[in-house]
Every structure is written in structure tokens, then in C-alpha cells.
Amino acid sequence: MQLSHLLLAFAMIFVMTIIHTPQVQADAMADADADAAINCRRYPRHPKCRGVSA
């Protein structure tokens, strides 16, 4: 395999990693919000759960 093909492959992997990373972070934040809602269902009187619909 030529060196240019290897460089192209690494460049594509690098770009796809950069594109995919924000989606992973958004999913992690959504999971944290879901966990907070579950905790508010279990502990509805907790001060942080005021105004959260169960």
C-alpha cells in the first residue's frame, strides 16, 4: 500500500472522530438528565426536584 493511501486513511479516521465526538457528548448529557428525572420520581421532595414532572 502506498504511503499516500495510509495518510488518507488516517486523515479520514481523524475527521470522523472529530465529527462523532459531539454526538457522544450530547448522548451523555441526555443520560444525565434522564437519571435526574428517575431520581426525582423516587425522591419527589428533594430540593433539586421541585418543578420536575415525574
From Swiss-Prot:
Q: Which residues form the propeptide?
A: 27-36
Q: Which UniProt keywords apply?
A: Disulfide bond, Secreted, Signal, Toxin
User: What InterPro entries does UniProt report for this protein, alphabetically?
Assistant: Pilosulin
Disulfide topology: C40-C49
Cellular component GO terms held in the UniProt record: extracellular region
**GO MF annotations in UniProt:** toxin activity
So which residues are the signal peptide here?
A: 1-26
Q: Where in the cell is it found?
A: Secreted
Question: What tissue specificity is annotated for this entry?
Answer: Expressed by the venom gland.
Summarize the protein's role.
Venom protein with unknown function. Does not induce paralysis when a high dose is administered by intrathoracic injection into the blowfly Lucilia caesar.
Give the record's family classification.
Answer: Belongs to the formicidae venom precursor-01 superfamily.
What's the protein called, per UniProt? U7-myrmicitoxin-Tb1a
